[in-house]
């Protein structure tokens, strides 16, 4: 069986070291063959969601106020004079709620005047519901796994973190007066998805190959200029953008969810992943 030599034949030249690396006979792979970085990240997300489920509603909201990203906080830190604008926007977004609830929201999210810059990252560890977490977990396992195999744990987590921050910043830019907390790992996962687009649509690549570290690292990554000539990659990107915009605009209902989709954060994370992937990539590059 020559399956271990496949990446050399399909994706480039092999020297003696690479040939020996790919030469071991095939072994039985587990059904869920996830990289350790993905497994540990999923475990952390599940443990956080489980821990929050044990908190009272008030304590959970306090936790959210410290870890979720609130665009209006960053706006007031940068432009303190826009307090009236924030209050007006909050009155519109919380219309129909009790006045006491509004005051409670202001006290928790805005009263201390702190910007809490760490929330640009920590919001990615929180989720609105178990369904929200499960949907993100499935997407992370599918698209984060090949990226984690190619980059290694450290670079993969750095990419996720940068995409998470990029998603928060684009969300803030588009909704700078919003007092509603932003939560979810979707921006980071969108960044990993964009990174995967740079190499998973290589000609001749089979889906089963993405479970092999050596194969994934041997696939030449598409330069951004050439990516637009890859019809499969372009189709995926188009479907991804259209789907996110439709869900974000509320044109397509979200089963079991009452919250809206922060599609701007998804797009911000996707763009960061697409652009920064080459800086972190340690695999083959297509010339």
What are these model-derived regions, one by one?
Residues 10-287:
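A detector for small-residue-rich transmembrane helices and their helix-helix packing motifs
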């Amino acid at each position: 069986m020559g399956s271990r030599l496949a990446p050399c034949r399909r994706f480039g030249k092999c020297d003696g070291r690479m040939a020996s690396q790919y030469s071991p006979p095939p072994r039985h792979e587990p059904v869920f063959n996830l990289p350790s970085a993905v497994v540990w990240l999923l475990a952390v997300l599940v443990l956080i969601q489980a821990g929050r489920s044990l908190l009272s509603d008030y304590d959970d909201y306090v936790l959210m106020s410290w870890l979720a990203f609130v665009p209006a906080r960053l706006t007031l830190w940068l432009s303190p004079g826009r307090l009236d604008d924030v209050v007006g926007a909050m009155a519109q977004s919380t219309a129909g709620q009790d006045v006491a609830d509004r005051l409670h929201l202001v006290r928790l999210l805005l009263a201390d005047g702190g910007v809490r810059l760490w929330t640009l990252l920590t919001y990615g560890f929180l989720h609105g519901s178990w369904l929200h977490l499960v949907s993100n977990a499935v997407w992370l396992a599918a698209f984060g796994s090949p990226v984690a195999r190619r980059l290694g744990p450290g670079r993969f987590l750095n990419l996720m973190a940068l995409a998470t921050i990029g998603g928060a910043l684009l969300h803030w830019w588009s909704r700078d007066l919003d007092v509603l907390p932003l939560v979810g790992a979707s921006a980071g996962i969108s960044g990993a998805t964009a990174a995967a687009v740079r190499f998973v649509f290589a000609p001749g690549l089979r889906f089963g190959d993405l479970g092999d570290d050596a194969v994934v690292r041997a696939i030449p990554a598409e330069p951004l200029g050439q990516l637009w000539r890859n019809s499969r990659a372009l189709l995926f990107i188009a479907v991804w953008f259209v789907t996110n915009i439709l869900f974000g605009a509320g044109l397509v209902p979200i089963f079991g969810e009452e919250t809206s989709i922060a599609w701007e954060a998804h797009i911000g994370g996707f763009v960061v992943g697409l652009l920064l992937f080459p800086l972190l990539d340690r695999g083959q590059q297509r010339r």
